[in-house]
């Protein structure tokens, strides 16, 4: 599944579960744009993802994670979290070894 379509489905699911209509997003975007995103016709910027997440009172990563769960329905949330945790733990341990700038 294409990322645009998966992200659109994740956005629609998160929006619907919160009982929000596309029109409710008028403060952050047009209904037309939301519709295009949900159908996979457009790709939002990271800034727009953050605006949507703030409006829905969720973390922006929730929308991104939802996208990848939509894209790979055989992958469960726990295994995805474990992969992300491993990636971030590795990066954090590497950054501790780097000298700090003054």
For the regions a protein language model found, what residue spans apply to each?
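DNA major-groove recognition helix of helix-turn-helix/homeodomain DNA-binding modules
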Residues: 47-63
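DNA-binding alpha-helical recognition surfaces that contact promoter or target DNA
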Residues: 9, 13, 27, 36, ...
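Short alpha-helical DNA-recognition segment
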Residues: 18-36
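DNA major-groove recognition helix of helix-turn-helix
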Residues: 29, 38, 48, 67
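A short, Lys/Arg-rich alpha-helix, primarily the initiator
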Residues: 1-17
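Short, charged recognition helix plus adjacent turn
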Residues: 65-102
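Helix-turn-helix DNA-binding elements, focusing on the entry/boundary residues of the two helices
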Residues: 11, 22, 31, 46-49
């Amino acid at each position: 599944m294409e990322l645009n379509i998966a992200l659109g489905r994740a956005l629609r699911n998160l929006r619907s579960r919160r009982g929000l209509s596309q029109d409710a997003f008028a403060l952050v975007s047009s209904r037309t744009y939301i519709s295009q995103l949900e159908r996979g016709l457009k790709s939002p910027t990271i800034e727009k993802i953050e605006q949507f997440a703030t409006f829905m009172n969720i973390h922006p990563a929730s929308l991104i994670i939802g996208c990848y769960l939509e894209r790979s329905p055989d992958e469960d949330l726990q295994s995805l979290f474990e992969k992300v945790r491993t990636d971030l733990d590795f990066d954090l341990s590497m950054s501790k070894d780097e000298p700090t700038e003054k």
